[in-house]
């Protein structure tokens, strides 16, 4: 069974399950409540407390355990409960700037583990990960709207995530990995700036859900003064990000500029209000990367079958 997973620093995403925070609590004894997964004699519970940012996600087992959660959710969504181990093919991705150096190690992180046994919701699972396809983020998201990009001589993809903002230049629909990088300008930096400013000026402790509500125009229950601070900080954040891209000699006022990722959805109003991008285009599906991984894996498999 092919399962596509986006291992974000803020959230883990799959195609058929709601995103969940990239955070775990490990315990030697069974905790009360929560989403608890049992693996190798330990209990793992999902938490809203994110794993601290790490450039290399293979440093410990936490992202593998998050992968087991994602696999179980996808098997459950497909009502896939066969006898014996389920053979799983994973489609995953990395930021374009890290792809060349890390893609082999990231794929091997999931392989050669044999049959992996675990339980979730008291249901036992046995999976055998027998193949992993690893692809560049941003490009994967662009694949989902490929028909609109393949005729463009130049398009810039900007993927605003939790800890990083990744960019990749496309030429006639093909990714140019010589023009890509990951900037530490993800929305978590914005959250921290907003929390500090609101605490200093209004003596209030905002959480990220309240910040999201303000930026998305929903009822946050906060005073107007707080909402103004949030929106002003968000506009400054977007301005700084776009200026950083311009300093890297990336043209934002000609050609297509495609924004993707949860951060782009969150900051759409500020991006559209900026005079630094002539005509931004948004991929609003926050699961665009994970869907792109699946498409790229399937295309790669067809290519192998046809001898390419």
Would you name each region that the model predicts?
Residues 167-172:
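PRPP/pyrophosphate-binding module of the type I phosphoribosyltransferase fold
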Residues 1-155, 174-189, 209-308:
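Nucleotide/phosphate-binding catalytic cleft detector across ATP-hydrolyzing
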Residues 202-205:
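Short, basic interhelical loop/turn and adjoining N-cap
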Residues 197:
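A contiguous pocket-lining binding segment that forms or flanks enzyme active sites
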Residues 160-166:
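Ser/Thr-glycine-rich phosphate-binding loops at phosphate-binding pockets of nucleotides
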């Amino acid at each position: 069974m092919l399962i596509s997973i986006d291992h974000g620093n803020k959230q883990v995403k799959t195609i058929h399950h709601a995103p969940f925070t990239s955070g775990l609590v490990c315990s030697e004894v069974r905790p009360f409540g929560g989403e608890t997964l049992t693996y190798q004699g330990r209990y793992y519970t999902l938490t809203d407390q994110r794993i601290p940012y790490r450039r290399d996600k293979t440093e410990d087992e936490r992202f593998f355990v998050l992968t087991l959660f994602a696999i179980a959710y996808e098997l459950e969504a497909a009502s896939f409960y066969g006898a014996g181990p389920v053979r799983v093919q994973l489609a995953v991705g990395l930021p374009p700037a890290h792809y060349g150096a890390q893609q082999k190690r990231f794929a091997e992180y999931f392989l050669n583990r044999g049959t992996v046994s675990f339980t979730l919701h008291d249901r036992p699972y046995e999976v055998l990960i027998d193949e992993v396809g690893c692809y560049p983020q941003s490009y994967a998201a662009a694949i989902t709207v490929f028909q609109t990009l393949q005729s463009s001589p130049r398009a810039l993809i900007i993927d605003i995530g939790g800890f990083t903002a990744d960019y990749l230049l496309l030429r006639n629909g093909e990714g140019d990995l010589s023009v890509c990088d990951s900037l530490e300008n993800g929305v978590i930096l914005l959250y921290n700036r907003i929390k500090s400013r609101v605490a200093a000026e209004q003596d209030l402790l905002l959480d990220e859900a309240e910040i999201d509500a303000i930026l998305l125009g929903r009822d946050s229950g906060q005073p107007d003064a707080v909402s103004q601070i949030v929106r002003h900080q968000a506009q400054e954040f977007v301005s700084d990000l776009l200026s950083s891209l311009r300093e890297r000699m990336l043209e934002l006022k000609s050609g297509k500029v495609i924004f993707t990722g949860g951060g782009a959805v969150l900051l759409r109003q500020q991006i559209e209000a900026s005079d630094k991008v002539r005509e931004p285009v948004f991929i609003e599906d926050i699961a665009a990367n994970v869907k792109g991984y699946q498409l790229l894996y399937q295309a790669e498999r067809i290519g192998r079958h046809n001898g390419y």
